[in-house]
Amino acid sequence: YAAAGADCLSVLTETTYFKGELKDLIQVVQDQPSWTRPLPCIRKDFMVHPYQVLEAAQAGARCILIIVRGLTDEEIVPIHRSAKLAGLDTLFEVHDEAELERALRHNPDMVGVNNRNLSTFQIDLSFAERVIPHMPKSVLKVAESGIKTAEDAARMRAAGAHALLVGESLMREQNPAALMKALQHA
């Protein structure tokens, strides 16, 4: 992915549903010195405790994912504060305008709109098209999930996305480098 032009790597560390492990993040970070272009890594997990933030920093992550839907505002505060104290960026994940409003109360670095409904797992790119325009200019806007083609990427950029978080499409693609280039040039 680095050779194909990725700007960042999202590494799943959640064990129960996504079969990732913290050691996967550690391995990716440790392997990077051999790469021609090392990349920052996001710890992608259900962050529910500040201890997980410290684990992420210790493992070499540069950013954590905070899924707004899964946390109360009171639970977000110590996780976000711990990330800032550890020098990590935060990507707040939202799915609708109400979650965006909650995320913005915490002054996030980045906000990603998940096009996958976490209740039904259905994907609809119109979620990002609807939510991204409500984000302030100061926030880095990310479109997440369901981006499979250059047309999808162009659609997300037209909605105002600065970045795309693409996982499943690249994992299933026989030529992920070609897909990445197509998404980047859309």
PLM regions and their residue ranges:
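Glycine-enriched alpha-helix->loop->beta-strand junction motifs that scaffold or abut catalytic
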Residues: G5-C8, D31-W35, Q58-I64, K84-L88, ...
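Alpha-helix-loop-beta-strand connector modules within alpha/beta enzyme cores
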Residues: K19-I42, F46, V68-R69, E75-E93, ...
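Short, small-residue-enriched loops and turns at beta-alpha junctions
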Residues: T15-K19, V48-P50, R69-D73, E97-E101, ...
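Acidic/glycine-rich phosphate/pyrophosphate-binding loops and surrounding catalytic core
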Residues: A2-T36, I42-R43, H49-E55, C63
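Glycine/Thr-rich beta-alpha phosphate-binding loop at enzyme active sites
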Residues: A3-K23, A103-I132
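Catalytic-face loop-and-helix region of soluble metabolic enzyme cores
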Residues: M110-V166
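Glycine-rich phosphate-binding active-site loops on the catalytic face of alpha/beta enzymes
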Residues: D7-T13, E55-E75, V113-F121, A159-M180
